[in-house]
Amino acid sequence: MNCLFCKIIAGDIPSAKVYEDELVYAFRDIAPQAPTHILVVPKAHIESCNGVTAENSAVVAHIFEVIPQIAKAEGLETGYRVVSNCGDDAGQTVHHLHFHILGGKKLALEMA
């Protein structure tokens, strides 16, 4: 297993966990881009958004049920951003589908 996030989920690499259930693992980013920066990943290895299929899309729907719970627990009542990079040109550095929750300050309108 060479996937960094698979190793984190397995407990082989430590992380600052903020949420876990049978399908999803969420932890604080080690290089935060905002005061609150959490990564939410499916436990099943899916390489990117391009790997979402009819067979595994339920986990993505579940992630979007979990994200508001995490945001509320983190005190992000005034807003937060959810981002997923897909592919090298988009800035995806770990090839395991993940969603960034960014918040804790007023975020810039520019996305790129």
Predicted regions and their residues:
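HIT superfamily nucleotide-processing domains
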Residues: 1-112
